[in-house]
Amino acid sequence: TTQDSYYAEADRFGKDGDFITAPEISQLFGEVLAAFQAWLWELSGSPDANEMMIFEAGPGRGTLFEDMHRSWRQICPQMAAAPVTFLETSPYLRSVLTSRFSGLDIHLAKTADNLPEVPLFGVANEFFDALAIRQAIKRDKGWVWRAIGLDIDQFVFCDGPALHPDEMRQHKLAADAPADSVAEFSPASEAVLARLARHVARFGGGVLICDYGKVNRQDDSLQAVRTHKAVPVLDMPGLSDISHLVDFAALARCAEAQGARLVGPVEQGRFLSELGIK
């Protein structure tokens, strides 16, 4: 449940948490993203503040948004004055955001459904890599879903049900794939991306996705980090940051199915460099 989740009651970010993201390293990251969004705003016809929305998926403590908002106050006052929607389910982080941005027009959402019907200018920084995935693994008799079982008092990975032929076709899994090949899918990521892509295709704007990812690779990318060190994925679940590499090709197909287009991906270093960070 949300109340029992990893982010529910603790601050997981920064040097005293489990991991550090780009906004905790330098405010330049947020400033560059703000400039990119301001450019996108101009390309979209420069809508007034009350005719658009700012959106962030997985804002954490609001560090990135604060840096972006500070920049917008200088370079794009319309974006600084626009209403903001944070997609955040953690009760703890929702409380932090409400307090931190009490002077702004902030809306907290648990899903990307029922957003205002206006152009959306959004960012998702290290958001999709934290959403749930499913894994399939190739065995001698075919593809099976990877499951989690209990060995005495320890969680362990085990083989689950075999994939139906329709599932193999849906996920483009080869029957002659090498033994122990692993394929990953994230229905949760595709559901959020589809909703945002549908919104952008209909009302305009765009969403900048910054994440660790891959393109059309089939391997096991599931990992866990606790206090800045790699740990076994099933070691003390709920107390470690579990993530995976985002499949940008899958997100691109999902966006295109909704009438939008995913541009990229490009390496983050190149993206930031071309926007001014050296």
Model-assigned labels for residue ranges:
Residues 116-278:
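Class I S-adenosyl-L-methionine
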Residues 1-57, 61-119, 270-278:
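Rossmann-like AdoMet
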